[in-house]
């Protein structure tokens, strides 16, 4: 247990940040999972709709500073490639 006031504050801050990070990481995973599930069942319309939402959300996280620009672009690019693959098939 912390012996100093500043150490106690740091513990509180760490807990708060951990919860916030967990929330965003879960949200990102769920967004990506939704697109991948639509791709898995070859539902082109649903996949494109979810890709549009994923693109919007991931870039919103970039503007908030949660994700780096290249990370979001890479994720969107890979999702886009998988959706395009089933659309052409």
UniProtKB/Swiss-Prot annotation:
RNA-binding as UniProt keyword: yes
Any one Gene Ontology cellular component term annotated for this protein: small ribosomal subunit
A Pfam family matched in the record: Ribosomal_S20p
Cystine pairings recorded for this chain: none
Annotated InterPro entries: Ribosomal_bS20, Ribosomal_bS20_sf
Keyword Transmembrane helix annotated: no
Keyword terms: Ribonucleoprotein, Ribosomal protein, RNA-binding, rRNA-binding
Record-level GO BP terms: translation
GO MF assignments: small ribosomal subunit rRNA binding; structural constituent of ribosome
Stretches of the chain forming a coiled coil according to its record: none
Function: Binds directly to 16S ribosomal RNA.
HAMAP family tied to this protein: Ribosomal_bS20
Family: Belongs to the bacterial ribosomal protein bS20 family.
Name listed for the protein in its UniProt record: Small ribosomal subunit protein bS20
Organism placement in taxonomy: Bacteria, Pseudomonadati, Campylobacterota, Epsilonproteobacteria, Campylobacterales
Gene (name only): rpsT
């Amino acid at each position: 247990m912390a012996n100093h006031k500043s150490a106690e504050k740091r513990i509180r801050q760490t807990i708060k940040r951990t919860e916030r990070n967990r929330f965003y990481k879960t949200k990102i995973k769920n967004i990506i999972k939704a697109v991948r599930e639509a791709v898995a069942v070859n539902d082109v319309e649903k996949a494109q709709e979810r890709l549009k939402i994923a693109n919007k959300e991931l870039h919103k996280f970039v503007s908030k500073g949660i994700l780096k620009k290249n990370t979001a672009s890479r994720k969107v690019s890979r999702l886009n490639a998988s959706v395009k693959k089933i659309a052409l098939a």
